[in-house]
């Protein structure tokens, strides 16, 4: 096992359109689930996995996100926060990482969405991704979950996982058993040749997967995608039962 990344990129620049009206006056990152902002749920998971620095991209209500993160640091809470400013233009997942390359350093990093919450059944899920990471074999390692153990993700799945951990993205019309649940490790330089401006990671992942360079791990637990107000209520109900 290689050393777990100490730096994470936290993707917090989205408009949160599907979360309206909760995002009429705040970004999705600051929507609270069970009394805690979504971004804090994710930052605390990353800190538990020994992440020391989080590079957070901001766009929609950027000032509110920055103020929240400064207040968090003022309380002495880890991790150290570095802002990647996308106020001029939101750059999506791939473009956001490319824009932040100078802030992310040389090694692999965690990349995390802020709208994924989970209840772990056996061990720490982020640690499981770190344990599976092997930079000789892979450029990306995805955290995955069974469609039967996830709420609010794609019912027809995203990927198949081979016995040796290789990811294959489903073809049109296929039903896959696993979904991507919002956390991965990657070599951030995979985005360097992407276009200037916004672009998604997904086409890049698919090209790398075709070359056998994308792996995955499916820890045990219940994963919840908090993408709209109804999903927020469902997540809070599940957390209350845990």
UniProtKB/Swiss-Prot annotation:
One Pfam family of this chain: NTP_transf_3
Reaction equation(s) it catalyzes: N-acetyl-alpha-D-muramate 1-phosphate + UDP + H(+) = UDP-N-acetyl-alpha-D-muramate + phosphate
Binding residues for UTP: 16-18, 28
GO molecular function, one term: metal ion binding
Keyword Transferase among UniProt keywords: yes
CDD domains assigned: NTP_transferase_like_1
Keyword Cell inner membrane recorded: no
Enzyme class: transferase
Domain of life of the native organism: Bacteria
GO BP: cell wall organization; peptidoglycan biosynthetic process; peptidoglycan turnover; regulation of cell shape
Residues involved in Mg(2+) binding: 115
Cofactor dependency: Mg(2+)
Residues annotated for substrate binding in this entry: 113, 158
InterPro entries: GlmU-like, MobA-like_NTP_Trfase, MurNAcPUrMurU, Nucleotide-diphossugar_trans
Keywords: Carbohydrate metabolism, Cell shape, Cell wall biogenesis/degradation, Magnesium, Metal-binding, Nucleotidyltransferase, Peptidoglycan synthesis, Transferase
Pathway in which the depicted protein is active: Cell wall biogenesis; peptidoglycan recycling
E.C. numbers: 2.7.7.99
Record-linked PANTHER family: N-ACETYLMURAMATE ALPHA-1-PHOSPHATE URIDYLYLTRANSFERASE, NUCLEOTIDYL TRANSFERASE
Record function comment: Catalyzes the formation of UDP-N-acetylmuramate (UDP-MurNAc), a crucial precursor of the bacterial peptidoglycan cell wall, from UTP and MurNAc-alpha-1P. Is likely involved in peptidoglycan recycling as part of a cell wall recycling pathway that bypasses de novo biosynthesis of the peptidoglycan precursor UDP-MurNAc. Is able to complement the fosfomycin sensitivity phenotype of a P.putida mutant lacking murU.
Family affiliation: Belongs to the nucleotidyltransferase MurU family.
Subunit organization: Monomer.
Protein name per Swiss-Prot or TrEMBL: N-acetylmuramate alpha-1-phosphate uridylyltransferase
Organism: Caulobacter vibrioides (strain ATCC 19089 / CIP 103742 / CB 15) (Caulobacter crescentus)
């Amino acid at each position: 096992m290689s050393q777990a990344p100490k730096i994470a990129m936290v993707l917090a620049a989205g408009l949160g359109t599907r979360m309206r009206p909760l995002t009429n006056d705040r970004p999705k990152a600051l929507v609270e689930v069970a009394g805690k902002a979504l971004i804090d749920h994710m930052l605390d998971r990353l800190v538990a996995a020994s992440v020391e620095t989080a590079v957070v991209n901001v766009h929609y209500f950027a000032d509110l996100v920055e103020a929240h993160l400064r207040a968090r640091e003022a309380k002495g809470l880890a991790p150290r926060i570095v802002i990647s400013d996308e106020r001029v233009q939101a750059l999506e997942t791939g473009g956001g990482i490319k824009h932040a390359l100078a802030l992310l350093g040389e090694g692999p990093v965690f990349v995390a969405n802020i709208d994924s919450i989970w209840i772990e059944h056996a061990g720490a899920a982020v640690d499981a991704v770190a344990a599976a990471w092997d930079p000789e074999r892979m450029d990306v390692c995805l955290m995955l979950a069974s469609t039967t153990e996830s709420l609010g993700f794609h019912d027809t799945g995203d990927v198949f996982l081979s016995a040796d951990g290789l990811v294959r993205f489903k073809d049109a019309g296929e039903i896959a058993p696993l979904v991507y649940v919002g956390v991965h490790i990657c070599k951030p330089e995979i985005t360097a040749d992407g276009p200037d401006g916004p672009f998604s990671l997904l086409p890049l992942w698919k090209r790398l997967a075709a070359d056998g360079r994308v792996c995955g791990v499916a820890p045990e637990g219940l994963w919840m995608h908090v993408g709209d107000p109804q999903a927020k209520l469902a997540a809070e109900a599940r957390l209350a039962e845990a």
